[in-house]
């Protein structure tokens, strides 16, 4: 990777010609609101979100895959997991489960963060390698205070018997320095669906953070942050196992320099380290004993950093680096003995080193980045033991793919970039953009090695995959049309070498494998807002279509037309709202692996909510979700493998009364 540093050095000696500049924030590109959503969490969390993925459903165009009561997996424009780059206070997070129990957003306990930023698609190159679906960034924003500030809160949800207690305090250490402590604890039981069943959806989480920061003499800011997240006994009816525990330690150091340094007018430096230890089994919560008992300890450890320098007020250049190590061991009870089966993730190390440049002017924005990605397993040939069902990862790859397929170090040279033209149109702001995004396949897609004596339970990566290449054209508009405030976008994404999962020989009873195909994804998002007789009326609509062009079939896990219609009355101290959440029928699916092999019915579900602020420091909220106690599931929800039997999705919760109280002093 040494050649990257030479290229990086050349970028940093570029002379910039003088031109009329726009105001640019180094941490976030300037763009139309159709492509970026920067939200205060307390403003969009109207129903006590259980985690970051659940919270994101409040943003138009973001859906979620439900596998249980916690760990909701966000989907943006038909893309999820490693097609989204997710940051927690600047730290890039990779989950520790190949079955996606713990998408990165599940480690964001929303009571402990201040804001979330969502960028849809490739509209910036500042946020790491890949991420063709978009960027999700949860942030805490802390500044010096003159006296201690306290906030305490209590949330409840009647259906699952869920209670969350949270607290936040900021202490002044001097006129420029501060100490912030915050934390939360949640316990939830099994929620009841509209049909009256209670799937295994209970969970327990705790989270706390320590932040120490100071303003330096030139106004620059230095901050260190430690976060601890603990999840215990998290049930997943949509998976074969549950979380026994998942423990996360996260460290970040941030330096934002506001005074010039050489050619740079400002500079951001961020370093991070995240360690996740995770144990899943089918014994702790399901009571499985004897033969068939399974447990899998895993880990995902990531460290890295980024340096971004602003040249003038309209250009940013930088470098970022990530190093992730994933390990997982597959174990099973046989003949009354614990048997080590194989390395599910065979000690895989993934490194990403990128350089980038991004520029904004009054009417045009563009960016370019180059990433060198190296992914290498280290235990692909570990001795498999004496039993016939035990194989080394390399033996398993060769067993399920044609020819001799073995794991080796993979290197990818990826180029991504975008160009966006902004223009005033019809009393509003419009844009059109063209982007290219190359994403290297992840650890699971390349080297997963789950074996089983039952063929369809095998889940095997493909060491010979190529990088995806997304080419997207997008257009958007924000302004007034026919008395409505409109915010919308349309997009068309053509993908070469899209990584898809499939069944061996296209047989639903055979192993789950991976391959590259050509694919297209296209759709739209639109928000219309209007004040009618003192009632704020907001309509959100989003639609995505995904096609596997190589196999002439739909892509899996694509949400149909969906949205919500909200009526809200607001005053200085109160708000009252009624919301209709709805989705169309989805009859386009690929039932071989991820989708259930039948269509999903449409639905309409009704919520009411209200908020009260009797004093500036005290706020109450109360509401009821799914008022009619309707049984429904979104098309994205995983199959319920415990209660409901074959071809039945994990249902959404039934009727629930929820509320919160927050007091600041």
Provide a role label for each language-model segment:
Residues 92-120:
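Short acidic/polar hinge/loop motifs at secondary-structure boundaries
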Residues 360-365, 371-373, 480, 485-591, ...:
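Gram-negative outer-membrane beta-barrel transporters
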Residues 43, 52-55, 72-75, 87, ...:
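N-terminal periplasmic accessory domains that precede
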Residues 188-190, 194-195, 199-205, 219-267, ...:
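Flexible loop and strand-edge segments within Gram-negative outer membrane beta-barrel domains
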Residues 21-55, 73, 81:
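N-terminal periplasmic "start-of-domain" segments of outer-membrane beta-barrel proteins
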Residues 137, 145-147, 153, 164, ...:
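Periplasmic-side early beta-strands and strand-to-turn transitions of outer-membrane beta-barrels
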Residues 491, 496, 584-589, 611-665:
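C-terminal beta-signal and adjacent terminal beta-strands/loops
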């Amino acid at each position: 990777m040494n050649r990257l540093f030479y290229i990086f050095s050349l970028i940093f000696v570029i002379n910039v010609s003088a031109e009329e500049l726009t105001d640019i924030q180094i941490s976030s590109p300037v763009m139309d609101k159709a492509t970026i959503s920067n939200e205060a969490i307390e403003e969009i969390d109207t129903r006590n979100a259980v985690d970051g993925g659940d919270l994101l459903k409040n943003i138009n165009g973001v859906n979620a895959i439900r596998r249980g009561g916690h760990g909701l997996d966000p989907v943006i424009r038909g893309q999820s997991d490693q097609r989204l780059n997710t940051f927690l206070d600047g730290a890039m997070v990779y989950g520790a489960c190949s079955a996606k129990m713990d998408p990165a957003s599940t480690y964001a306990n929303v009571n402990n963060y201040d804001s979330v930023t969502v960028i849809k698609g490739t509209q910036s190159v500042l946020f790491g390698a890949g991420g063709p679906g978009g960027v999700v960034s949860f942030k805490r924003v802390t500044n010096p205070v003159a006296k201690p500030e306290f906030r305490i809160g209590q949330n409840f949800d009647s259906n699952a018997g869920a209670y969350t207690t949270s607290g936040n305090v900021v202490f002044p250490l001097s006129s420029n320095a501060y100490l912030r402590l915050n934390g939360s604890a949640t316990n939830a039981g099994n929620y009841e669906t509209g049909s009256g069943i209670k799937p295994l959806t209970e969970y327990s989480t705790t989270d706390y953070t320590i932040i120490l920061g100071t303003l330096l003499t030139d106004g620059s800011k230095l901050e260190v942050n430690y976060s601890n997240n603990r999840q215990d006994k998290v049930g997943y009816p949509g998976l074969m196992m549950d979380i026994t525990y998942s423990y996360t330690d996260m460290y970040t150091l941030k330096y934002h320099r506001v005074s010039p340094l050489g050619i740079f007018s400002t500079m951001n430096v961020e370093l991070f380290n995240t360690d996740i230890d995770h144990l899943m089994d089918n014994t702790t919560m399901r009571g499985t004993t004897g033969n068939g008992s399974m447990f899998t300890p895993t880990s995902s450890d990531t460290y890295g950093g980024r340096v971004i320098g602003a040249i003038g007020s309209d250009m940013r250049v930088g470098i970022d680096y990530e190093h992730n190590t994933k390990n997982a061991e597959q174990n099973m009870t046989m003949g009354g003995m614990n048997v080590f089966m194989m390395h599910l993730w065979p000690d895989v190390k993934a490194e990403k080193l990128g350089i980038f440049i991004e520029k904004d002017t009054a009417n045009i924005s563009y960016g370019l980045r180059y990433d060198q990605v190296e992914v290498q397993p280290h235990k692909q040939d570990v001795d498999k033991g004496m039993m016939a069902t035990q194989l080394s990862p390399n033996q398993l790859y060769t067993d399920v793919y044609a020819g001799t397929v073995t794991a080796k170090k993979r290197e990818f040279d990826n180029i991504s970039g975008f160009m966006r033209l902004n223009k005033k149109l019809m009393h509003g702001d419009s844009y059109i953009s063209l982007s290219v995004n190359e994403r290297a396949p992840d650890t699971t897609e390349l080297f997963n090695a789950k074996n089983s004596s039952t063929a369809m339970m095998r889940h095997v990566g493909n060491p010979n995959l190529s990088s995806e290449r997304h080419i997207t054209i997008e257009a958007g508009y924000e302004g007034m049309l026919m008395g409505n405030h409109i915010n919308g976008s349309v997009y068309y994404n053509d993908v070469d070498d899209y990584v898809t999962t499939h069944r061996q020989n296209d047989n639903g009873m055979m192993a789950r494998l991976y391959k590259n195909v050509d694919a297209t994804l296209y759709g739209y998002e639109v928000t219309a807002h209007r004040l009618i007789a003192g009632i704020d009326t907001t309509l959100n609509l989003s639609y995505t279509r995904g096609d596997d062009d190589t196999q002439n079939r739909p892509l899996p896990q694509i949400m149909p037309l969906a949205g919500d219609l909200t009526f809200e009355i607001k005053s200085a101290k109160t708000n009252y709202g009624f919301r209709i959440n709805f989705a169309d029928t989805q009859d386009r699916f690929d039932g071989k692996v991820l989708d259930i092999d039948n269509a999903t019915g449409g639905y309409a579900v009704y919520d009411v909510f209200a908020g009260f602020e009797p004093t500036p420091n005290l706020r109450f909220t109360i509401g009821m979700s799914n008022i009619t106690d309707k049984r429904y599931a979104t098309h994205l929800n995983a199959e319920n493998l415990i209660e409901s039997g074959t071809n039945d999705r994990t249902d959404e919760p039934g009727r629930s009364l929820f509320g919160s109280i927050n007091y600041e002093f």
